[in-house]
């Protein structure tokens, strides 16, 4: 499992640990990743993803997983998240066609 957020593609960064005597040592800054289960309103089921806490805040801001995925770019999403996005788009399209008929 990679240390990368499945929604925002946030990953590890490299920087320096600086001591009191100003000696710089390479270190990695890892993202704060959590395993969380989202509920998709469109799909009517639970979706388990590994996301950063920053992405979790963004999902809440956009009104849930469905709203976040529909506005997100495919390049930033993991293959699993892109698949979920396609399922949501398909479900919404069929719901709109059923409402018109």
Swiss-Prot record:
Record GO biological process: translation
Q: Which SUPFAM superfamilies match?
A: L28p-like (SSF143800)
Q: Which residues form a coiled coil?
A: none
UniProt entry keywords in alphabetical sequence? Ribonucleoprotein, Ribosomal protein
Q: Which GO terms describe its molecular function?
A: structural constituent of ribosome
Annotated Gene Ontology cellular components are:
cytosolic large ribosomal subunit
Which NCBIfam families does its entry note? L28
**Family classification:** Belongs to the bacterial ribosomal protein bL28 family.
- The protein here is known as Large ribosomal subunit protein bL28
State the organism's lineage. Bacteria, Pseudomonadati, Pseudomonadota, Alphaproteobacteria, Hyphomicrobiales
Q: Which gene encodes it?
A: rpmB
């Amino acid at each position: 499992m990679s240390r990368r957020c499945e929604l925002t593609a946030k990953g590890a960064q490299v920087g320096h640990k600086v001591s009191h005597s100003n000696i710089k040592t390479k270190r990695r800054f890892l993202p704060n990743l959590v395993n969380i289960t989202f509920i998709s309103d469109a799909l009517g089921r639970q979706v388990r993803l590994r996301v950063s806490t920053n992405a979790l805040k963004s999902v809440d801001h956009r009104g849930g997983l469905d709203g976040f995925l529909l506005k997100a770019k495919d390049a930033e999403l993991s293959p699993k998240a892109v698949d979920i996005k396609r399922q949501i788009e398909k479900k919404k399209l069929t719901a709109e066609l059923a409402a018109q008929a």
